[in-house]
Amino acid sequence: KMPGRDSAPIPDPLIWLAYLAAVTTTIKLATGILIVPQRNPLVLAKEIATLDNLSGGRFHLGLGVGWLEEEFDALNVPFSERGRRTDDYVAAMRSLWENETASHHGEFVNFENCICSPRPVQDRIAVTVGGHSEAAARRAGRLGAGFFPATGSHAELRRLHLLARETAEKFGNDPATIEFTSGGYGVFGPNALDEAQKLSDIGVERIVVPSFLFFKDTENLVAQYGEEVIQKAQSL
């Protein structure tokens, strides 16, 4: 069941970020997360390449395999295939982004001599795998991508991060490139810096703080949070 009310708006992330790209100049534009196996990989590759090109290389793909089986039923995508589809789709999209003429022959995606233009500004689109499970940690390692387990104890987060790095090494990827992100529910309030320090100690490099924590007085609260927490946390 989706959290919140049935009437709660959930905008399409890529359209939302295209709007933000037009009204900003430096902020990174990331999905958190985009459910890749629910989309056509060639169309998605084109959309992401266009967004990265128009934003000057600011796009960061946070992806997941999905969790709500009813969504997959509505889209006529087998729920049991979502992990394998994600791996195949990412490989296909990377081929389109990184080659002038791309070919890919996988379990679910097959194409020959395909051109995706405009190309992304980034040499390689930044990718982070979301999910607080061993499967997600292993996927991050296999793909040589960042890893974002949104929840979990410090011990559990440390264990999953280690698994992602071990898997990366097993598949010939540099473990040091597995950028570790964590949810920031605890990095808010009077103990924010203490929690940020604890997360930093277990290897977390980026903390994502939910925007709804600032909903009452957004502009002033974000500015205050920047001064009291973000600036100080950057030196940890």
Go through the PLM ranges and name each one.
Residues 1-236:
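Active-site-adjacent structural elements that line small-molecule/cofactor binding pockets in enzymes
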